[in-house]
Amino acid sequence: MATPVRDETRNVIDDNISARIQSKVKTNDTVRQTPSSLRKVSIKDEQVKQYQRNLNRFKTILNGLKAEEEKLSETDDIQMLAEKLLKLGETIDKVENRIVDLVEKIQLLETNENNNILHEHIDATGTYYLFDTLTSTNKRFYPKDCVFDYRTNNVENIPILLNNFKKFIKKYQFDDVFENDIIEIDPRENEILCKIIKEGLGESLDIMNTNTTDIFRIIDGLKNKYRSLHGRDVRIRAWEKVLVDTTCRNSALLMNKLQKLVLMEKWIFSKCCQDCPNLKDYLQEAIMGTLHESLRNSVKQRLYNIPHNVGINHEEFLINTVIETVIDLSPIADDQIENSCMYCKSVFHCSINCKKKPNRELRPDSTNFSKTYYLQGAQRQQQLKSSAKEQKSWNKTQKKSNKVYNSKKLVIIDTGSGVNITNDKTLLHNYEDSNRSTRFFGIGKNSSVSVKGYGYIKIKNGHNNTDNKCLLTYYVPEEESTIISCYDLAKKTKMVLSRKYTRLGNKIIKIKTKIVNGVIHVKMNELIERPSDDSKINAIKPTSSPGFKLNKRSITLEDAHKRMGHTGIQQIENSIKHNHYEESLDLIKEPNEFWCQTCKISKATKRNHYTGSMNNHSTDHEPGSSWCMDIFGPVSSSNADTKRYMLIMVDNNTRYCMTSTHFNKNAETILAQIRKNIQYVETQFDRKVREINSDRGTEFTNDQIEEYFISKGIHHILTSTQDHAANGRAERYIRTIVTDATTLLRQSNLRVKFWEYAVTSATNIRNCLEHKSTGKLPLKAISRQPVTVRLMSFLPFGEKGIIWNHNHKKLKPSGLPSIILCKDPNSYGYKFFIPSKNKIVTSDNYTIPNYTMDGRVRNTQNIYKSHQFSSHNDNEEDQIETVTNLCEALENYEDDNKPITRLEDLFTEEELSQIDSNAKYPSPSNNLEGDLDYVFSDVEESGDYDVESELSTTNTSISTDKNKILSNKDFNSELASTEISISEIDKKGLINTSHIDEDKYDEKVHRIPSIIQEKLVGSKNTIKINDENRISDRIRSKNIGSILNTGLSRCVDITDESITNKDESMHNAKPELIQEQFNKTNHETSFPKEGSIGTKCKIPKYRQ
């Protein structure tokens, strides 16, 4: 018996073989069902029998192997069966090859029996047709690969259709049916060509019988249809409609127009112009007739100088030459703009009576050349005589008008030449004779002139002629007048001709022109400045008296240095060496280097910082190992809760920047932020900080920071005193970040207290922009792991947006208008400012409208200053002043020793003693940043809806569940949730609970600046200060904090993670000591009533 493993192996191999057999049988069946096998083709019986015999033999071998496999015993090895199965696979491959050969033989029989019928065939490439040409047999035509992609429904495009069809025939090696020598082609080829050209014709184009199957008749029918609609007069008008000048700078449109005219003549030339010259000369005259007189000479000169390209037709070469000439001459006319004509609505002035055609009388031959070619016999002779009379009369009128001008006082402006020549030597400045036998040639080879010399002609280019330009000009006595190149004139002086060639000039000067015999002239005295007689000045060389001569004298370098007032040694040596003094001096140098102690002391300077020295230093360190840091501030602001300082750290290698804003710059704050930044770099970027550069500020040179750097093994490099350039990278980045933040605040019309969010946004953007020194993104360069950055993930700072309100009520809008600030580093969302609630929240459910609107209507209304939150001092001047203060802080941020008002200036000695006694007790609001005094109440909860009950129900969330442990952040959030204001609530009426959604109350609570609040909140005794106006006056006089008012003046950032513990002693103290200290303060304290600072409050216990 066979084992389970052997049975499984046998079944798998058997199934694979059966699948291959069935797939091959299906393939053979599909081959039999192809269109070629369904044709009436006789197949020999022997070939069919051979196919069946091979198939039966294969099945017999397969059945024999299966029977032999079943007879194998359990001890037999299965290797023998695998070898036999391998041989069976080889047999299957042989049978497949024979099947393919048989199919090819059947197809060959079909083609031999039906040579005159077009059949479809299929191979690995696709469907194809077989046909014979005059030069080859059995050519294959694949319709998918050989596509004729031109379609037309217009009779006007028949020449283009025939031209593309001729290129298609030549490309795919069909017989050229357009040749007169070819009369008959293969019927299969004829059927293919008829099918292709009929696909190119539109359905609405009725030019012939649709049942026509002869390609020659189809082509003749297309030509006859086109000739019947385009007679001699039609073609003459088509040529006369086109006028090409230097304003036709659209090369694609110009080439399309001229090629269409050329094709029109090529397909009907042999039938209509039998007595005319050959097609080549006729088309050349026709194309030259479309050119303006100012352009024709330049084209002729280019055709004469440039050899003809053998690879293209003569007409294509001529059209390309015209286009190149127009392109070369068009930049000269800077004041000309290519527009459609206002009369004929065309770029080429295609109307015969167009008023904008410049100088129509200048093209007498171009308007009549087609008529003279087409007219025959007496009519042609009569037309020639009439045109000659018109030419003579036109010449007479020109001669009469030319008598007024004197050729010696005129200058010719040549638009087709690049060389300036003159016959008047007196016009040339700095003239020099030419020793070489230089000769210039015109259009003809026999019209050469010799050059005798060269100089410069000064062109008047201003009212006072103070900015004259010089043109290199050759002196040719044989020339009749002075010729100035229009191209050279425009290049040097930017003087160009107007559209109608009536003026020559630029923005400063304009000169009238006169066209004489088709040549542009200007007056010489208006264009050229003649050289004056006293232009050369001979300088008088000073000489000493012949009777007096000074003897040579020796002098030491030290003596000369003292005599010349302690000036530079090198200047003294050069002055004596070059004999600038009358006496002859011999300078004696000391063997040792000269040293002047007086100069060294008096002229001492700072050390020079060479350009790129810091870059060379940064390349020696790996990314993230070397940093430079500095502090910016203080930022002047009337708001006490505005952060005033910014710490910046920049990587010297990758230019990655890290910024943070703070209320102060003491050692504890700066050290905590540096420690946080270093830990972030080591954890997120997998980099090791080894070196930090900073200045000698007290915030960087204290013992705490030095101890931390020593513990981390970081090398702290300090700059020299007052050597700010040594820390120039941090200084430069401070300027970059602050100017970016100032720009964002200015364009968004936000207050200066939002500058910390603008700094965060600017820092994130700078880290994701390529730096010009490294050529990389700083974020990608510093990270050891690959980082992906998306541009669309950045939102525009200060723009309007809509965020989802998760606290919205039913039948109320679920969106809140907000202002985009910056990315939240502690979440995947963005920070938004909600003006209606005066809050800053983080959300990733937002919608941004189209902010790419017109800048003139953006930010026309300051929505951030609503009537609810604005004070009487808020206006546009205050906004400008806040941004100005930030800019002034940038300029003067190095001056950190600004006078700070002390508490002694605000309070009396009795009040200060009370503040000092309260300072020893820890305050639960030490972790709070701002100028709000958070109020608590211990009023019992009642059922009446009055003010007292509302206060008690609101504060129950603080006193409930005393067994829970609250962190500093949770405690602060509870304190923030208890902020109340009762200025707008009617105490006599009921309070609707729907107005308490945001945990805000309306109560007249007076605000205390944060400087005083840190000492007051959590105090044991109440400071009894009844004169509120006196405190306000004292604060105003010292410019500290903001004016005490009764309105809400603070924006609470409920997502700000920067609320840190300001009292580290409180943070590090034991829970038992903290509880003991709070138990001492756990009793009611009487604050002044409404109208004075504070209110009745009770400090809750610290929960363990």
UniProtKB/Swiss-Prot annotation:
Location in the cell: Cytoplasm; Nucleus
Entry binding sites for Mg(2+): D630, D695
Region annotation (Ty4 protease) maps to 381-501
Where is region (Integrase-type zinc finger-like) located? 539-599
Q: List the disulfide bonds.
A: none
Catalytic machinery residues: D414
List where this protein forms a coiled coil: 48-112
Gene3D superfamilies, per the entry: Ribonuclease H-like superfamily/Ribonuclease H (3.30.420.10)
InterPro entries tied to this protein: Integrase_cat-core, PolX-like_BBD, Retrotran_Ty1/copia-like, RNaseH-like_sf, RNaseH_sf
User: GO CC annotation: what is one?
Assistant: cytoplasm
Sequence ranges assigned to domain Integrase catalytic in this UniProt record: 619-786
Keywords of the record: Aspartyl protease, ATP-binding, Coiled coil, Cytoplasm, DNA integration, DNA recombination, DNA-binding, DNA-directed DNA polymerase, Endonuclease, Hydrolase, Magnesium, Metal-binding, Nuclease, Nucleotide-binding, Nucleotidyltransferase, Nucleus, Protease, RNA-binding, RNA-directed DNA polymerase, Transferase, Transposable element, Transposition, Viral release from host cell, Virion maturation, Zinc, Zinc-finger
Q: What is its EC number?
A: 3.4.23.-, 2.7.7.49, 2.7.7.7, 3.1.26.4
UniProt name for this protein: Transposon Ty4-P Gag-Pol polyprotein
Q: Which organism is it from?
A: Saccharomyces cerevisiae (strain ATCC 204508 / S288c)
Could you read off the lineage of the organism from its UniProt record?
Answer: Eukaryota, Fungi, Dikarya, Ascomycota, Saccharomycotina
